């Protein structure tokens, strides 16, 4: 399965936040939307990504205030991303190698989606369940 196919299934909604926004605002959005990361953008420019992990390590463990800390201060600036043509296996390999959980999807210079490790696993398990069901039907003569 490709990233494009996954985005068509789950929708291409990408929640973003400005680098100047507070970490508190970022965490509020993540909690409200039940997501683990936000893409940090300035206009149409991808600036970074901020995750729950960034919050835990760079704010909580350092005793900083989420209301006084900007996303720019703790975001991961070196963002790994994929294009819609990539396969989910390629995404999982990249996430595993780089020890990350979210990949923005870029097409023609524009942010068109985000893929999480959970999205990949759900899609792959669903495909495997379908294959198993088909094989069981075949074995039963159906």
Residue ranges with predicted function:
Residues 1-13, 51-81, 87-96, 117-142:
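Tandem CBS (Bateman) regulatory domains
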Residues 30-33, 38-54, 95, 103-118:
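A glycine-centered beta-loop-beta connector
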Residues 1-47:
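A positional/architectural concept
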Residues 17-34, 81-99, 106:
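The conserved cystathionine-beta-synthase
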Residues 77-78, 101-113, 139-142:
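Short flexible/disordered coil segments
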Residues 21-32, 61-74, 109:
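Short, charge-rich amphipathic segments
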């Amino acid at each position: 399965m490709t990233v494009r196919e996954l985005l068509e299934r789950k929708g291409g909604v990408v929640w973003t936040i400005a680098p100047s926004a507070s970490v508190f605002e970022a965490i509020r959005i993540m909690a409200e939307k039940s997501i683990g990361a936000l893409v940090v953008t300035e206009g149409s420019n991808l600036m970074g990504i901020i995750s729950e992990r960034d919050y835990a390590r760079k704010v909580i463990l350092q005793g900083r205030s989420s209301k006084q800390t900007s996303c720019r201060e703790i975001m991961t600036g070196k963002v790994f991303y994929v294009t819609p043509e990539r396969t989910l296996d390629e995404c999982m390999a990249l996430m595993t190698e780089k020890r990350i959980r979210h990949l923005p999807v870029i097409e023609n210079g524009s942010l068109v989606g985000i893929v999480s490790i959970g999205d990949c696993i759900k899609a792959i398990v669903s495909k495997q369940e379908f294959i198993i069901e088909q094989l069981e039907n075949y074995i039963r003569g159906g």
